[in-house]
Structure formats: structure tokens, C-alpha cells
Amino acid sequence: MEGDIAQMGQFIGAGLAAIGSGAAAIGVGHVAGNFLAGALRNPSAAAGQTATLFIGIAFAEALGIFAFLVALLLMFAV
């Protein structure tokens, strides 16, 4: 009985940690959407901002990967 409760806690914790992957997708959408809005307002400055766009997307995706790793650790290592 106690093992079942511990396993249930692992699954709940992993599910909550996996929510971060969805938050990363929302973050990437915001970064790309704001870049597109700025590029449409000032097309001449858009070429200089693409590096910043990719850095922002990389940071947002890194948070999603960290959330996924935490979920895996909660599932299999704890």
C-alpha cells in the first residue's frame, strides 16, 4: 500500500513538472510573436534582431528541456 502511494506521488510530481514543457511552448510563441510584430513595424531593423530572436527561443526551449528532465528524474530516479 505504501509503495502504491509513493508511486502515485512520483507520477503526480512528474506530471506537474511536465507542465513546464507547455509553458516553454507558450514562451516561444510570445518571443516569435513579438519579434514578428516588431519586424512588421520596422522592417529595416528586423535583420539585426534575428540573433536576439534565436537566443530568446533557445532560452525558452532550455526551460522546457529542464522541466522534461525533472519529470524524468521524478519518474525513474526517486
Swiss-Prot record:
Signal sequence region: none
A single GO molecular function term of this UniProt record? lipid binding
- What transmembrane ranges does the database entry give? 11-31, 53-73
Classification via InterPro entries: ATP_synth_F0_csu, ATP_synth_F0_csu_sf, ATPase_proteolipid_c-like_dom, F/V-ATP_Csub_sf
Q: Mostly located where?
A: membrane
Q: Where would you find this protein in the cell?
A: Cell inner membrane
Alphabetized, the UniProt keywords read:
ATP synthesis, Cell inner membrane, Cell membrane, CF(0), Hydrogen ion transport, Ion transport, Lipid-binding, Membrane, Transmembrane, Transmembrane helix, Transport
A Pfam family annotated for this chain is ATP-synt_C
Q: Does the keyword Ligase apply?
A: no
Alphabetical GO CC annotations of the entry are: plasma membrane; proton-transporting ATP synthase complex; proton-transporting two-sector ATPase complex, proton-transporting domain
> What membrane topology term does the record carry?
Multi-pass membrane protein
**At what residues does the UniProt record annotate the site feature described as Reversibly protonated during proton transport?**
61
Q: Which family does it belong to?
A: Belongs to the ATPase C chain family.
According to the record's subunit comment, the protein's assembly and interactions are:
F-type ATPases have 2 components, F(1) - the catalytic core - and F(0) - the membrane proton channel. F(1) has five subunits: alpha(3), beta(3), gamma(1), delta(1), epsilon(1). F(0) has four main subunits: a(1), b(1), b'(1) and c(10-14). The alpha and beta chains form an alternating ring which encloses part of the gamma chain. F(1) is attached to F(0) by a central stalk formed by the gamma and epsilon chains, while a peripheral stalk is formed by the delta, b and b' chains.
Q: What does this protein do?
A: F(1)F(0) ATP synthase produces ATP from ADP in the presence of a proton or sodium gradient. F-type ATPases consist of two structural domains, F(1) containing the extramembraneous catalytic core and F(0) containing the membrane proton channel, linked together by a central stalk and a peripheral stalk. During catalysis, ATP synthesis in the catalytic domain of F(1) is coupled via a rotary mechanism of the central stalk subunits to proton translocation. Key component of the F(0) channel; it plays a direct role in translocation across the membrane. A homomeric c-ring of between 10-14 subunits forms the central stalk rotor element with the F(1) delta and epsilon subunits.
Fetch the PANTHER family from UniProt: ATP SYNTHASE LIPID-BINDING PROTEIN, MITOCHONDRIAL, ATPASE PROTEIN 9
The protein's name: ATP synthase subunit c
